């Protein structure tokens, strides 16, 4: 007898025509209730960047995102090699 597949979470629907937002800079801030991540794109040699997207989430959601990113980056590095961090990154 086979077991029915367990649900893996909500069905994710991507709206038709949705454009991706490229970001090479993120700014993170928080309040007691929320974590705010601003994603921006900055060009080489520029001193300012325009925020392309702002994501506000609960601290729990941020921790779950951190866990998912950690797992996915580990898989990425296992497949493609270690990602080198620049010496001036924070």
List PLM regions with ranges.
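Positively charged, low-complexity terminal tracts
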Residues: 1-90
């Amino acid at each position: 007898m086979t077991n029915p597949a367990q649900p893996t979470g909500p069905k994710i629907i991507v709206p038709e025509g949705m454009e991706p937002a490229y970001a090479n800079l993120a700014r993170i801030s928080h309040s007691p209730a929320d974590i705010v991540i601003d994603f921006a794109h900055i060009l080489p040699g520029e001193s300012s960047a325009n925020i392309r997207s702002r994501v506000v989430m609960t601290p729990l959601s941020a921790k779950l995102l951190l866990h998912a990113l950690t797992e996915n980056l580990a898989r990425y590095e296992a497949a493609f090699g270690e990602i080198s961090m620049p010496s001036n990154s924070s």
